[in-house]
Amino acid sequence: MPFDPRLQPLTAAEARVLGTLMEKARTVPDSYPLTLNAVVTGCNQKSSRDPVTTLSDAEVQEALDSLRRRAMVVEIGGQRATRWEHNFTRAAGVPDQSAALLGLLMLRGPQTAGELRINAERWHRFADISSVEAFLDELQSRSEEKGGPLVALLPRAPGARESRWTHLLCGPLSAADMAAQAAQAAAPTSSARAADPALAERVAALEAEVAALRGSLAALCGQLGVSLPGQP
C-alpha cells in the first residue's frame, strides 16, 4: 500500500532524516549510503536547511528505526559501520522527479515553483518551471487510493509575488497552519540568510554584478553625453 501521510505522518525529525538521505544519494553518490554520523551531520548542516536543526545521534537513530519499520529507509550492514539508504521513491510510489521536489520541501521548507527549479539543480534538472508545476500538480491531485495529496499550494502571503508549495508528509494542514506557513516563508530574515552561506554568496554575487552593470551604464551615458536613467 502506498505511503499515506494521513494515517502515518512523519515527525519533523523523520522528515529531516529522510530528506537528508534523499539529498545525499543525488549530490554525493560516492559517499552513499550514509553512516549514522554522516546522517546526523547532513541533518544539522547550516546550508540548504530551513529550519536549521541540532538533532542528536539518538534522535536520528530513533527516526531511522521508525522509517525502517515503514520500509522508507533500508539498513545495510557493513564491516566497519552500518549504513543507511532511502527507499522513498518506491514506498511512496512517486517518480524520481516528484521525489526530488518532496525532498527539497522537507529540507528547505515552503518554496515557489521557481525556487524549487533552482534548488533542484543538483537533484534533477527540470527543463522549465512548467515542468516543475506539472509534477507538483500531480502530487497535489494524488488519488485517495494512492494515499492522497503529498503537497499543497499555500495561500499567497501579503506582499509576495507568488504562492509557495509545502509538503504534507507530516500530515494534513489546517487553513490556519497553511496561512502561518505562507507568512513565515514570505518573511526572510537576516538570520535565515546567515544560516545559508550559499544563499548569502549568491546574493553577494548578484549585488556585485548589478553594481558592475550600473558602472558600465554610467560610463556609456557619459560617452553619449546623456543622463543616467533615473537621474535629472
Curated annotation (Swiss-Prot):
Transmembrane segments: none annotated. It comes from the Bacteria. Pfam families: DUF480. Belongs to the UPF0502 family. This is UPF0502 protein Aave_3438. It comes from Paracidovorax citrulli (strain AAC00-1).
